[in-house]
Curated annotation (Swiss-Prot):
The keyword Mitochondrion does not apply. One of its GO terms (biological process) is G1/S transition of mitotic cell cycle. The keyword Cytoplasm applies. Residues 245-264 have a biased composition (Polar residues). Residues 245-267, 443-483, 644-677 are annotated as: Disordered. Residues 647-659 bind DNA. This is Transcriptional factor SWI5. It comes from the Eukaryota. It is found in: Nucleus; Cytoplasm. A motif (Nuclear localization signal) lies at residues 635-659. Residues 471-480 have a biased composition (Acidic residues). A zinc finger (C2H2-type) spans 550-574, 580-604, 609-632.
Length: 709
């Protein structure tokens, strides 16, 4: 056996001079780590320690043990669960197969390490076999402990390399996992940002759609707001209103009565104001031609009676100024009747001077033309309904009803419960009668040229103003006052002490003689009543029939009405809409109409009307009915009162739905009176019971007082 490559001889240990550079076996087998045995003194120490006694093993046994240890040193196929490693369980999306592919073939590396170690051992084994021929005797005496140490050192160096590679692979896997986690977080943040951007985009698109719809709806006539700054006024009349800086001009909102009851007229004509101001633009306060598209938004002007030979080009033109609430005096009285919130004044400007007595020059407020000398044109002023956004004040119910400063009219001139006869409308009221302050610019006293009264009613006293009753209306829906006050031919002899509850308005008390009337028919549209329901909730149940009647579309109800106001009040009862509530302590009643609330409030007052039998009443008409029944010691016959005995209560609708016009004795007698005899008797009785004081003021005397005298 050749022992030239052997580095250890047990028999010559004491005289060993070992050179590491000339030992081929040492350089081949331990070339990777020669520093382990670089010190000569270390080998001398090992020789003196008799290593043969420490590792008493032969070569075959050593090889078998080392191979078993190498097989047991297989590297794990996944990351170790130490403190610095990343837990794979935190990433549920990574399964075993994926980790095997990402672990950079650690299993193959471990196998390569095992093969390398085996090849080294085999090479060492061959070298030793070749050296046995030279040093066979020496090697036979040499123990196998030193060979064991050499192979163990080679194995340790290989294991250290594999551990280094394993640590590098583990650190690389942790780095990749951290990068994946960061990428996922960035992806989530980007998705959230995308969602926010999509939401903002949808909101922007919705706003654009709303703006587009607003622009499409605003393609119609545009009216200038009173607060808008306009160029200075010029000399034209249209420029006075179109370019005025004063907030007292506003576009026409409604030309209807404040009761919502349209008064009919025949031969409706179309009017359109196309005159331009000095700036070349059409004035904003012009009326559009009446057609189906403007019936709900624009109101045509009043019909003006003109000469037959007058051309269409010389017809009067209209603009509608508006008296602001801040310039209207608050003429609040104890009126028991609803009045208009504001006064809408329709000014009629004539193109040509009208000098004829019958050329339609009604009394009204004058407007001074700027820069033009001469007499001011004639105008006509009428009481119009308030704007839609302002609700009327309930007299005595200020605490629970929205209110504004407004001109109120005493119910002494309105609520007289007068039987219907031939009636005259007036639309000309003096400035002081309306209670308008003199601070309004460019206003003159009313003209004295149009104090003209028509018809055969010149002998009637104009001091009595009544509400316009409708004998064609249903009894269960009481009629409200019309937009124009009415002078009746036959004032009522019953409610002559109404002023006890409602004092005369100071504005009208001294100027009542200035009221003049003229006969006219006015187109009108309905206004929206005071309601607690959303806008349009009542009108959707109203159906206008071809015969100018109105049908209720509420489910299960097929009633028809001749007045729009009545059907609107009727629908409010269906919808439980009662905006007028009683403010008396402890009373929670509410009503659809204001006059029902007023009548109810009288029940909380002291009963001021007493019968000789001892029974008291809140209302004078109730006392008259009681005495006319002749059921007590205070019974009395009245010529103009006919009592129809009915088991049903007054003011309640009949169950069969039949007409109840006969529920009012006065209406019944008037309807039966074809020759006018009853009307004459009523008027004659009223004149006989009226006395005058020294100032000529008419005092209404109760029938009971007349009887006592």
């Amino acid at each position: 056996m050749d022992t030239s490559n052997s580095w250890f001889d047990a028999s010559k240990v004491q005289s060993l001079n070992f050179d590491l550079q000339t030992n081929s076996y040492y350089s081949n087998a331990r070339g990777s780590d020669p520093s382990s045995y670089a010190i000569e003194g270390e080998y001398k120490t090992l020789a003196t320690d008799d290593l043969g006694n420490i590792l008493n093993l032969n070569y075959g046994e050593t090889n078998e043990v080392i191979m078993n240890e190498i097989n047991d040193l297989n590297l794990p196929l996944g990351p170790l669960s130490d403190e610095k490693s990343v837990k794979v369980s935190t990433f549920s999306e990574l399964i075993g197969n994926d980790w095997q592919s990402m672990n950079f073939d650690l299993e193959n590396n471990s196998r390569e390490v095992t093969l390398n170690a085996t090849s080294l051992l085999n090479e060492n084994r061959l070298n030793q076999d070749s050296g046995m021929t030279v040093y066979q005797k020496t090697m036979s005496d040499k123990p196998h402990d030193e060979k064991k140490i050499s192979m163990a050192d080679n194995l340790l160096s290989t294991i250290n390399k594999s551990e280094i590679n394993k640590g590098f692979d583990r650190n690389l896997g942790e780095l990749l996992l951290q990068q994946q986690q960061e990428l996922r977080e960035q992806l989530r943040a980007q998705q959230e940002a995308n969602k926010k951007l999509e939401l903002e985009l949808k909101q922007t698109q919705y706003k654009q759609q709303q703006l587009q719809a607003t622009l499409e709806n605003s393609d119609g006539p545009q009216f200038l707001s009173p607060k808008r700054k306009i160029s200075p006024a010029s000399e034209n009349v249209e420029d006075v209103y179109a370019n005025s800086l004063s907030p007292m001009i506003s576009p026409p909102m409604s030309n209807t009565s404040f009761t919502g009851s349209p008064s009919r007229r025949n031969n409706r004509q179309k009017y359109c104001l196309q005159r331009k101001n000095s700036s070349g633009t059409v004035g904003p306060l012009c009326f559009q031609e009446l057609n189906e598209g403007f019936n709900d938004s624009l109101i045509s002007p009043k019909k003006i009676r003109s000469n037959p030979n007058e051309n269409l080009s010389s017809k009067t033109k209209f603009i509608t100024p508006f008296t602001p609430k801040s310039r209207v005096s608050s003429a609040t009285s104890n009126s028991a009747n609803i009045t208009p919130n504001n006064l809408r004044l329709d000014f009629k400007i004539n193109v040509e001077d009208q000098e004829s007595e019958y050329s339609e020059k009604p009394l009204g407020l004058g407007i001074e033309l700027l820069g033009k000398p001469g007499p001011s044109p004639t105008k006509s002023v009428s009481l119009k309904s308030a704007s839609v956004d302002i609700m009327p004040t309930i007299p005595g119910s200020v605490n629970n009803t929205p209110s504004v400063n407004k001109v109120s009219l005493s119910s002494s001139y309105i609520d007289q419960y007068t039987p219907r006869g031939k009636q005259l409308h007036f639309s000309s009221i003096s400035e002081n009668a309306l209670g308008i302050n003199a601070a309004t610019p460019h206003l003159k006293p009313p003209s004295q040229q149009a104090r003209h009264r028509e018809g055969v009613f010149n002998d009637l006293d104009p001091n009595v103003l009544t509400k316009n009753t409708d004998n064609e209306g249903d009894d269960n829906e009481e009629n409200e006052p019309e937009s124009r006050f009415v002078i009746s031919e036959t004032p009522s002899p019953v409610l002559k002490s109404q002023s006890k509850y409602e004092g005369r308005s100071p504005q009208f008390g001294t100027h009542i003689k200035e009221i003049n009337t003229y006969t006219t028919n006015s187109p009108s549209k309905i206004t929206r009543k005071l309601t607690t329901l959303p806008r349009g909730s009542i009108d959707k149940y109203v159906k206008e029939m071809p015969d100018k009647t109105f049908e209720c579309l509420f489910p299960g109800c097929t009633k028809t009405f001749k007045r729009r106001y009545n059907i609107r009040s009727h629908i409010q009862t269906h919808l439980e809409d009662r905006p007028y509530s009683c403010d008396h302590p402890g009373c929670d009643k509410a009503f659809v109409r204001n006059h029902d609330l007023i009548r109810h409030k009288k029940s909380h007052q002291e009963k001021a009307y007493a019968c000789p039998c001892g029974k008291k009443f809140n209302r004078e008409d109730a006392l008259v009915v009681h005495r006319s029944r002749m059921i007590c010691s205070g019974g009395k016959k009245y010529e103009n009162v006919v009592i129809k005995r009915s088991p049903r209560k007054r003011g309640r609708p009949r169950k069969d739905g039949t007409s109840s016009v006969s529920s009012s004795p006065i209406k019944e007698n008037i309807n039966k009176d074809h020759n006018g005899q009853l009307m004459f008797k009523l008027e004659d009785q009223l004149r006989r019971e009226r006395s005058y004081d020294g100032n000529g003021t008419g005092i209404m005397v109760s029938p009971m007082k007349t009887n006592q005298r």
